[in-house]
Amino acid sequence: MQEKQKKAIRWISPVLIALTALIVWRVNYEIEFMMDDEWYSTVLYADTPIRNLSDIIRAQIWHYFNWGGRSMAHALLQLILLAGEHWADILNTGMTLLLGWLACMIADRRKLPYWFAALGMILGLNANWKMSMFWEAGAANYLYMAGFLLAFLFCYLKYEEKNLPGIVIWILPLGLIAGWSNENMGPAVWLLSLLVILLRHREHKKAPVWMYLGNISCLAGTILMIAAPGNFVRSGETGEEAYSLLWRMYLRCYAEAKGVMEYLFPALLLTVFALIVCKGCLLYTSDAADDLIGV
């Protein structure tokens, strides 16, 4: 009986993954470019539509000095917008699949049932899937940047020198993009990469050169993002400086707490419920569930 179940899982998993990809593509197809996408389709400082890579470079230079420091995410956004909605739908679908696979690689669970499970969690536990995965500006900032972040973390968490040819070279741009991703995860992955280096020093008395290079480039990306002149220009336009430091801290904490309750808490509640159900199933079947999914 168990062998039949394993065989069924082998056949069903790729079908479910393909169905998930089709659904993700279709949702992308139904959601058109909107809101900030319309502005980022221009050179930003004028209503002129972007036509080529040169326009994007000029737009991002203006953006960096006048609006904000997320240059990597917004340059990628403009490239996707330039490609058009048809290609954006395909790229977004491919990035969703890749993100799920990267999660499986980091977890060292590289079989199709795990891939489908990862995709299910990316969609099912997403606090606001429309605005973070299917709205193009949100996808560029969170879906695509999450891919770069996981790729960078994979190098540090699953390091095997023989499987990472040329890493001394390509870890530099990868670290720069990861650090330059967004104001929360950029510093977080830098700290995690630093922790890995410290642990390797404790265990092996040294760390590979590429780890230092990646850490430094990640830190450089984070600094370039946070210290962007546009951040201060935009902050001045919002009138935040009119409030005292203590009041600004209160407003920020209130906004964070509200965001946690509205977006993060439901996802955390669902995660806890799923873990309890899975734990119960494992206890009931005496590890049979793990045997089945590990086909």
Could you say what each language-model-derived stretch is?
Residues 167-189:
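Membrane-interface alpha helices of multi-pass inner-membrane proteins
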Residues 62-86, 90:
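Short hydrophobic/aromatic helix or loop-helix immediately within or flanking a transmembrane segment
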Residues 23-65, 77-78:
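Extracytoplasmic loop-helix module adjacent to an early transmembrane segment
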